[in-house]
Amino acid sequence: MTSSRQQQDIGAWIIVGFCFLALAVSFSARSSLSLIMEPMEKELGWSRTTTSAAASLAQIFMAAAAPIVGNMVDRFGARFLLSSGLAAVGGGVVLAAGAHTSWQFYLSYSVIAGIGFGTAATHVVSTVVSLNFTARRGLAVGIATAGATGGQLVVIPILARVLEHTDWRTSYVAIGISALALAPVVFLLIRPRAADIAARQERRADSAPMSERLSFLLRSPTFHLLFWSYFICGITTSGVIEAHLIPYSVFCGFPVATSSDAFGLLMAFNLGGMVLAGWLSDRMNRPLLLGAIYILRGLSFIILMFIAGDPALLVTFAVMFGVFDYSTVPVTASLAASHLGLKIMGLTMGMLTAGHALGAAVGAQMGGVLFDLLATYQWTWIVALITALLAGVLCFAIRENRERGWLVPATA
């Protein structure tokens, strides 16, 4: 291997590392809402529906931002987008810490930070990493996007301990400052290679209008299978689990610290599951792999229904669900690259992420409304089980086709 090639490889892995960190901070800020729900509701007198609406509204703004951001990645690269997304996350979360009314919290967390969540996001990271790798692409995407869980593995259990000694507002300020501090670091250290700049300029010059590229996607059966399975992915992960697992665990009688430890354990296995799924996506039939992930995730909800009073079952669920949580991301990104083309990878992943966010909005709000109406989460888990099984069936309908060689569609 030549010195120049070694430097290129090192540069590509540096991008992977800082993409990991960006997702770690962004996703930790997003998921921390589930941890502060109880103290925030007690202080402000809000219902579970009101606090769940903040998560749901944030997902809607993520959905609105995702395709636009994805299109911008294709044309301008990820450096500015990741750093500005982190700045929006940090600023929004700091403002949310000072909220005293629901509209103030919605504006700061759901709108400002929500747009940041949709910008410093897995679809941006998976796109920039895919464009920097040919060999070991699935592994690289798996490692980079594992930041979405890696940060939560560390931050959420620590935050739970901090909440034992201070209020939720102080904790939120600390998270926001972390995001603001990382934003300029990402901008300075994720430097595009000369070849990447030239390729981006070529894509910009050759790029068809966004409407034409969207038309190509909407005519593709593969896109619809990926989109609707990813919509369900949002319901069953960011929707019901990210927003409601810790409150549900506390409702079942577990202390907040124990509940957050279980969430941290889930994220530990989540991280490993993402890397493993990325590695497997380079080696086996990807539609079968993706479908199996959804089905096994769905079956884990059966365990969740019976955790009350049984710490062993809580741990068992955390391990099983963790392995099959975000492990859909690298496999979905790999299929998007091979079946829909690298030239519109950003737009494709943006559209898929929009679907995921809309599903998460449905799941988060559904959990809050059903809990307020029925004083139980059981129907939430039943819906999650059924929809996850449906997502698996959708993925089995996708044809494996590696031989297309990451082709770019003619309309792009």
Feature map (PLM): residue ranges:
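Residue-level signature of mid-helix packing/kink "hotspots" within the transmembrane helices
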Residues: 31, 59-67, 153, 267-275, ...
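Extracytoplasmic gate region of multi-pass secondary transporters
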Residues: 33-37, 221-274
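Intracellular juxtamembrane helix-capping segments at the cytosolic ends
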Residues: 40, 119-133, 327-340
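Conserved MFS/SLC helix-loop-helix module at the cytosolic interface between two early adjacent transmembrane helices
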Residues: 64-102, 281, 287
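Hydrophobic core of transmembrane alpha-helices in multi-pass small-molecule transporters
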Residues: 104-120, 231-232, 313-327
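Cytoplasmic helix-loop-helix junction between adjacent transmembrane helices
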Residues: 110-146
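Helix-loop-helix hairpin linking two adjacent transmembrane segments in secondary transporters
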Residues: 148-195
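C-terminal transmembrane helical hairpin of 12-TM major facilitator-type secondary transporters
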Residues: 258, 264-270, 276-335
